[in-house]
Amino acid sequence: MIKEELNLWAEGVEFKHWDAYYNFILSVLDFLCIKEYELSVILCNNEYIQKLNSQFRQKSEPTDVLSFNYLEESGQIDHKIQGDLIISLEYLEFSSLEFNVELYDELQRNTIHGILHLIGYTHKTNDFQNEEMLIIQEKVLRETRRVF
């Protein structure tokens, strides 16, 4: 059924750091003890993610990251992944300026965020001090962060 499979590609954007990004994702999966995964990550532009956001979430606007989980959700944290992450690099360019961080930091943060959603974490707010998922996200980022 599930194996160790990680696929990366781009839609409408240029990205030059595939090897570093691939190894970063593997380090996140390892840190979170995820041994079984079929994960595809698409780096895209705002137009691409907006179409998906409209189709699947009925929100006609771009967003930073979308996660699509193909495993049956149990309501508990699962350490298996079968899903897709869609991340808008164009959106992250703006948010990295807004938060005064490097683009690769924002990419890594959003990748971790999407992976946490795929294994069952949720959050109701963006409170980095009190939301368990966001606290874990920042811990994982501190432990696995790479410079591209």
From Swiss-Prot:
Provenance organism: Borrelia turicatae (strain 91E135)
Gene3D superfamilies, A to Z: Metalloproteases ('zincins'), catalytic domain (3.40.390.30)
Textual note on the cofactor: Binds 1 zinc ion.
Full protein name: Endoribonuclease YbeY
Cofactor: Zn(2+)
Example of a GO cellular component annotation carried by this entry: cytoplasm
Cross-referenced PANTHER family: ENDORIBONUCLEASE YBEY, CHLOROPLASTIC
One Gene Ontology biological process: rRNA processing
